[in-house]
A protein has these predicted regions:
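Acidic/glycine-rich phosphate/pyrophosphate-binding loops and surrounding catalytic core
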Residues: 86-136
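Short, charged, intrinsically disordered terminal tails
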Residues: 1-5
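Compact, glycine-rich, soluble single-domain proteins
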Residues: 7-101
Length: 136
């Protein structure tokens, strides 16, 4: 029988966020949600802010993943992320403030507003609020 696990590495500019065996990992890509099991076809995909789900033999973990890309091979998944946070690392008050700032920038609609940047900031804030709220 084929191995049911693969090595999962999640690396951000500031740390190795996760390095261990996983049975499955789910994440949000620019094309939608993707779930990866051992033996997946090789693939490289761009990631969007969203909830990262890791299934291991001893349970499940979730984290807020903010941009990056994933390289998938049959026996290893490597995620290079702008940032990644466990729920207990998120300051929900700061995330709420970031959400309000992004919404204000988008509503102002002035020429100086970088809409793509404001939308990205809003997505990140909503992801942080969502996952932190689940683990209160």
């Amino acid at each position: 029988m084929a191995d049911k696990t693969f090595n999962l590495q999640i690396i951000s500019p500031t740390r190795v966020f996760f390095d261990g065996d996983a049975e499955m990992v789910e994440m949000k890509t620019t094309e939608g949600e993707i779930g990866v099991l051992a033996g997946h076809i090789p693939l490289t995909v761009i990631l969007e802010p969203g909830i990262l789900r890791i299934k291991q033999a001893d349970g499940k973990k979730e984290a807020a993943l903010h941009d990056g890309f994933v390289k998938i091979t049959k026996s290893k998944v490597t995620i290079l992320a702008e940032s990644c946070e466990w729920p207990d690392e998120i300051d929900i008050n700061r995330a709420e403030e970031a959400k309000m700032r992004a919404e204000r920038r988008l509503k102002s609609g002035g020429k100086s507003v970088d809409v793509m940047r404001a939308e990205l900031a809003l997505k990140k804030a909503l992801t942080r609020i969502d996952i932190a709220g689940r683990y209160k």
